[in-house]
C-alpha cells in the first residue's frame, strides 16, 4: 500500500490516486483490531481457610437429608432411630403435647405402688378419712336434691287436691294425714321465694294504715304471719293450727260470733270449689260496711267481672281493685247488706293453680 501523499498544488487533483479499502460493518467504521486477552492469574491457596473448614467438619458431621443433630454417617440405623426418637419426644414435651415422663416409682412384689409416709402423717390422714367417710359433700348434695324433689312432688299433689275439691274434703285430707299440712307449707315457702313479690306484705302494709282498734280475721292464715306483723287483734284460722294462737277450723264454718269483725283477709286462700260458702261465712262474721281484702294469682281469673258479680250476690260491693300488678290481683270489697248463711246460690270457683314439675 502506497502512503498517502499530498501532491503539490501545482500538479492539480487529477494525479491523486486512492487505493480502495474494503469496508467493515456498515461501511462507515474502520476495521478494529482484536484485543488480546490477558491470562488469569491463579490464586494462591490460603492455609488458614482450609484449617477452619477442617475444624468445622470435625465439629459437625452431616447426613444427607438430616439436620445438624442427625447421627454421623458411620453410625448404625438403630442408633440413628434412637436419637431421632429422643429428639422427637423432646419437641413434643416443649410444645406441651405430652407430659414429661416421671421416674418410675418403686413397686412392691404384688405390683402395687408403695407409698411411704411418716407415722404422724399417716395417723392424721387416717383420722381425716374416718371423719369424712360417713358424710361427704357429694352425698349431702345428692340427698338434699332427692329430698327437695320428694318435697316438691308431695306439695304438687296436696295443692292439686285442695284446688279440685271442696273445703270439707280438704279438711278430711289433713285430718287423715297430719304431716300433709307441714309438707304443703314447706313446698309453699319454696314457691314464695320464686315470686317477684309476696302479696301478703302488701296486705300487711295496708292493714297498718287502718285504726288499731279494728278486729281482723285472717282466713286461711297458713303460718300466721299477719298476726305477727300488725298491732291489731287478729283471729288467725286455717285447717291445721301451726301455732297455739291459730284456730284450727274450716273457714266456711268458723267459731267466731256473728258481726264481730271489721276486716276479713283472704291472701292466696281461695282454694276449693265452693267459694260461695267462703263469702257467706265472711258476710256472717263481718260487721256492716266491713272490708274484705283479697289477693290471688292473676292466672286464676278467667273473668274478673264474673268474680265481682259472685261476690255481689254474697252481699259485697267492689270498692277497689288492682289488676295491673304483674302476677297478682288485689281486690277490696265492702259488706253492704246481710245475707243469710243458708242462702242457696250457685257454687263458683277460680281456675286451679297447678305447679308444674321443674
UniProtKB/Swiss-Prot annotation:
GO terms for cellular component: chromatin silencing complex; nucleolus; rDNA heterochromatin. Its EC number is 2.1.1.-. One of its GO terms (molecular function) is rRNA (adenine) methyltransferase activity. It comes from the Eukaryota. Residues 1-81 are annotated as: Disordered. S-adenosyl-L-methionine binds at residues 185, 220, 238, 267. This is Ribosomal RNA-processing protein 8. It comes from Drosophila melanogaster (Fruit fly).
Amino acid at each position: 500500500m502506497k502512503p498517502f501523499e499530498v501532491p503539490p498544488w501545482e500538479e492539480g487533483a487529477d494525479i491523486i490516486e486512492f487505493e480502495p479499502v474494503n469496508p467493515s460493518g456498515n461501511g462507515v467504521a474502520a476495521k478494529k483490531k482484536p484485543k488480546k486477552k490477558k491470562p488469569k492469574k491463579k490464586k494462591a491457596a490460603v492455609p488458614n481457610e482450609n484449617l477452619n473448614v477442617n475444624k468445622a467438619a470435625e465439629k459437625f458431621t452431616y447426613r444427607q437429608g438430616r439436620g445438624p443433630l442427625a447421627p454421623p454417617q458411620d453410625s448404625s440405623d438403630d442408633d440413628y432411630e434412637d436419637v431421632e426418637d429422643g429428639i422427637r419426644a423432646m419437641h413434643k414435651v416443649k410444645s406441651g403435647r405430652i407430659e414429661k415422663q416421671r421416674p418410675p416409682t418403686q413397686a412392691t412384689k404384688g405390683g402395687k405402688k408403695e407409698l411411704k409416709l411418716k407415722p404422724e402423717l399417716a395417723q392424721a390422714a387416717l383420722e381425716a378419712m374416718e371423719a369424712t367417710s360417713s358424710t361427704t359433700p357429694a352425698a349431702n348434695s345428692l340427698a338434699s336434691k332427692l329430698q327437695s324433689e320428694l318435697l316438691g312432688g308431695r306439695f304438687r299433689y296436696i295443692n292439686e287436691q285442695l284446688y279440685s275439691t271442696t273445703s270439707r274434703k280438704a279438711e278430711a285430707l289433713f285430718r287423715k294425714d297430719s304431716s300433709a299440712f307441714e309438707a304443703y307449707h314447706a313446698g309453699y315457702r319454696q314457691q314464695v321465694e320464686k315470686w317477684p313479690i309476696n302479696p301478703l306484705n302488701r296486705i300487711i302494709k295496708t292493714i297498718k294504715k287502718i285504726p288499731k282498734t279494728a278486729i281482723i280475721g285472717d282466713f286461711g292464715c297458713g303460718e300466721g304471719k299477719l298476726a305477727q306483723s300488725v298491732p291489731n287483734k287478729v283471729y288467725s284460722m286455717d285447717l291445721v293450727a301451726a301455732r297455739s294462737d291459730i284456730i284450727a277450723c274450716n273457714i266456711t264454718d268458723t267459731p267466731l260470733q256473728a258481726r264481730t269483725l271489721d276486716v276479713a283477709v283472704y291472701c292466696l286462700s281461695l282454694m276449693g270449689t265452693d267459694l260461695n260458702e267462703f263469702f257467706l261465712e265472711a258476710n256472717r262474721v263481718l260487721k256492716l260496711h266491713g272490708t274484705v281484702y283479697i289477693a290471688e294469682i292473676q292466672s286464676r281469673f278467667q273473668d274478673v267481672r264474673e268474680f265481682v258479680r259472685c261476690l255481689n250476690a254474697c252481699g259485697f260491693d267492689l270498692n277497689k281493685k288492682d289488676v295491673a300488678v304483674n302476677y297478682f290481683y288485689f281486690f277490696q270489697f265492702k259488706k253492704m247488706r246481710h245475707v243469710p248463711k243458708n242462702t242457696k246460690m250457685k257454687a263458683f270457683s277460680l281456675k286451679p293453680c297447678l305447679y308444674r314439675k321443674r
